[in-house]
Amino acid sequence: MLRDGNEGMSTIPGFNQIQFEGFCRFMDQGLTEELYKFPKIEDTDQEIEFQLFVETYQLVEPLIKERDAVYESLTYSSEFYISAGLIWKTSRDMQEQTIFLGNIPLMNSLGTSIVNGIYRIVINQILQSPGIYYRSELDHNGISVYTGTIISDWGGRLELEIDKKARIWARVSRKQKISILVLSSAMGSNLREILENVCYPEIFLSFLTDKEKKKIGSKENAILEFYQQFACVGGDPVFSESLCKELQKKFFQQKCELGKIGRRNMNRRLRLDISQNNTFLLPRDILAAADHLIGMKFGMGTLDDMNHLKNKRIRSVADLIQDQLGLALVRLENMIRGTIGGALRHKLIPSPQNLVTSTPLTSTYESFFGLHPLSQVLDRTNPLTQIVHGRKLSYLGPGGLTGRTASFRIRDIHPSHYGRICPIDTSEGINVGLIGSLAIHAKIGRGGSLESPFYEISQRSKGARMLYLSPGKDEYYMVAAGNPLALNQGLQEEQVVPARYRQEFLTIAWEQVHLRSIFSFQYFSIGASLIPFIEHNDANRALMSSNMQRQAVPLSRSEKCIVGTGLERQAALDSGVLAIAEHEGKVIYTDTDKILLSGNGDTLNIPLVMYQRSNKNTCMHQKPQVQRGKYIKKGQILAYGAATIGGELALGKNVLVAYMPWEGYNFEDAVLISERLVYEDIYTSFHIRKYEIQTHVTSQGPERVTREIPHLEAHLLRNLDKNGIVMLGSWVETGEILVGKLTPQMVKESSYAPEDRLLRAILGIQVSTSKETCLKLPIGGRGRVIDVRWIQKRVGSSYNPETIRVYILQKREIKVGDKVAGRHGNKGIISKILPRQDMPYLQDGRPVDMVFNPLGVPSRMNVGQIFECSLGLAGGLLDRHYRIAPFDERYEQEASRKLVFSELYQASKQTATPWVFEPEYPGKSRIFDGRTGDPFEQPVIIGKPYILKLIHQVDDKIHGRSSGHYALVTQQPLRGRAKQGGQRVGEMEVWALEGFGVAYILQEMLTYKSDHIRARQEVLGTTIIGGAIPNPEDAPESFRLLVRELRSLALELNHFFVSEKTFKIKRKEA
């Protein structure tokens, strides 16, 4: 965080800073750390030695630009070179060469990586910090059982338990445990050393029986006992070196490597002074942990809160990428060892370049970015989504939790989250509470701790010093919560203020306060901070709003919100969608494609984004805002991006809304809208779809892209150019050909049609031996072709086919079935589009644009929408914009209501419209029915809230099935739009049909129109030619499946068919 010149004031940190700092930490420290771990490699005869010279490494600037990497499906990466030496020990000769280790993907200005043409982002993970933790649980008798859990750097756990006889056990597996004396002896301590290093030797001696003495009589005996319990081996195993190696690999390496963070935590918790470089568990640690456990048993010491953030660590992008580099270097080491041995066996002279290949590093990073759960495709629905995605914190992933096993306690909000993790912004569903979002001012400190800033209040000096505190440290201070000084230093402090101390809330005198918060948004994430009047909303609805703002579609014409929070500008600046001047200068040329700047004798070319597709098919576009000949300064905005206007985030529109029921069309959150929103393109958005086809070389020859496609109607090919590819600017409809392609196939003489054989025999005409495999426009894809990319085969690549991509732009107006939402969790589906003359209208004659259901407010307790609605109306009339900080009630009671009513009153005075503020029912107004002209019985709340159009659009969801695939087992239609699936008649549908008594329809739906294989084909035929549908003569497939399942349970079930004519029983086999 930066400090301003004003004392006690600060600026908001960059929202992408977390990602940048992590990647820079990897480049500065992590890269060299892993290279220094790479060992010197010798052959088996120790004649040759291979080593890397770490100081000589270099990263080369990428050869391609980011935009080209996206279009050509390449990785935006840097080539990694380092010097390596091969030393012959007999002659002391050394051969040194610069070798190519591989490609390391780089981070771009958005804080993301481009891998195979896809924007990917690595999110941060929260893990249990390595160290020791003491807990108490009740057994089945209601007696407290104390345990100490040692967590290793790799996530392995070693549990120490104390029973009611004060005997201490180490649990080596789920079912087996050994005495603490056996464990200490196996780690190298004898009995005398054990008794000298513990605080309670008499307790250790109390459970030292003769049998126990024999087990710890020597280190070998202790290891044998340990191995017997660990591996559950019976009999009398014999001590050997292989037995020790197995224990080392399977137990000690997984459960006893603490790492630097674990060593620091262990020293602090057990008050030890072991060196930080000693990162393995020692006998001294085990004995000190046992002493503490005995103390817990007798009521001394404090238990640990496993969910406290001081006991967690953040695994950032730096840690994850560094781990992958270490993994790649281990693979490279094994490969070099094998290659050296092979070369010497065949009496070849190796060189560093022959020994090293780039495959381990390149493939490791590609698999990491492509397959790792914490590497995700960047969500680019709108600018806000891009920022928020990189600030996520996940408990899931390797070494973490799973959505099905995580307890409620882990998902819950903890007091230590204050100012570090947003208490509101989390995902809905099974992962609720497991995927959080960083608070605005939080940062990742040394050792992976989450730090939050505070102002230190000093009685000596009037100045406020800002400091970052890790989760455990702020508990020892009195922290003032929600004090006005956080916004205005000139305000006189109250005598008594609410404060936080050791996870409790107190009321104390101002003189006792040590720290105060620095900003009113300090506790929230970016998404939650963009909700005005958030303090008047239920937290569940604020959570929904935080998520839904990320689903808002950029509109064709953006509009600033009348009521905001003040963070809109910062969010737009950090999102990367704005073009910002990096140098001052003069604009010498500008168009929709680029801006040319002249300054300091150089000409700078700034390319603009034109109709670029995001991975959610939304349109990313930049509009230049500077004119030729104008002088600009560094940091000035040159072009606005998608969903931004005036340098601020603009996700929706300010529309006139009435809260009232209307003929049942807004029942259950449905929304009634005016046709003005359609005809004036208020909620029109552009979407870009990508369609691609590849040409392969088959066994019969290469596939051809051509315009000459036989047996296809001419109108389907009318948009193709001479090469067989659709022309730019063409309007294409469903079913039309985008790319013409023929695939060769082997055709036997006998498979020709008779007329084809006749043509060949008489005229010698060669009939086509190719089948058409053209790229056709699927259903719902109509639009304008805006770009075509033909990506040729890479040089020297035999496997990479040619790819042709066609980009089609769609213009979508708002329609029935689309989803809209406000910023307070108030969401709904468009149910009807009314003519504007039928909409309710105000006293000045203006028809409203939307009608919301008023019953959606009281039960959901999101009253903030009412404040925003009324203040938006006042702002629209006064031509003002408001930026409201949250929790304004701390200044005075009813501050929000007073502000809204005063602005409404001022608007009614200045615009001479007394109906805007009527004292009898302030905030409400009498409005009229557009169909009859009569006033409605009750006054209605009207206003101008900010309403978003979400990406859940009916064009993407509507689906019908005429024919398609069936499931192999049940012979019923598949599920889902992507599989061309259909609806099935389930038990609830059967109940509905039974309720209406429609026996024949029920029979059809359950038999020959459903899963009766032969009968459903006959139904199709009789429907086409007309006639009676024949009755099936055997059982449907679902009944046969039931019979088979019962047979698998050893229940024989036969079914019989009774003929209508003879009434004779005919037995049918299932």
Curated annotation (Swiss-Prot):
InterPro entries: DNA-dir_RNA_pol_bsu_ext_1_sf, DNA-dir_RNA_pol_su2, DNA-dir_RNAP_su2_dom, DNA-dir_RNAP_su2_hyb_sf, RNA_pol_bsu_bac, RNA_pol_bsu_CS, RNA_pol_Rpb2_2, RNA_pol_Rpb2_2_sf. Its EC number is 2.7.7.6. It is found in: Plastid, Chloroplast. One of its GO terms (cellular component) is mitochondrion. It holds the Pfam family RNA_pol_Rpb2_2. GO terms for biological process: DNA-templated transcription. It catalyses: RNA(n) + a ribonucleoside 5'-triphosphate = RNA(n+1) + diphosphate. It comes from the Eukaryota. Transmembrane segments: none annotated. One of its GO terms (molecular function) is DNA-directed RNA polymerase activity. Keywords: Chloroplast, DNA-directed RNA polymerase, Nucleotidyltransferase, Plastid, Transcription, Transferase. Its main location: plastid. PANTHER family: DNA-DIRECTED RNA POLYMERASE I SUBUNIT 2. DNA-dependent RNA polymerase catalyzes the transcription of DNA into RNA using the four ribonucleoside triphosphates as substrates. Belongs to the RNA polymerase beta chain family. In plastids the minimal PEP RNA polymerase catalytic core is composed of four subunits: alpha, beta, beta', and beta''. When a (nuclear-encoded) sigma factor is associated with the core the holoenzyme is formed, which can initiate transcription. This is DNA-directed RNA polymerase subunit beta.
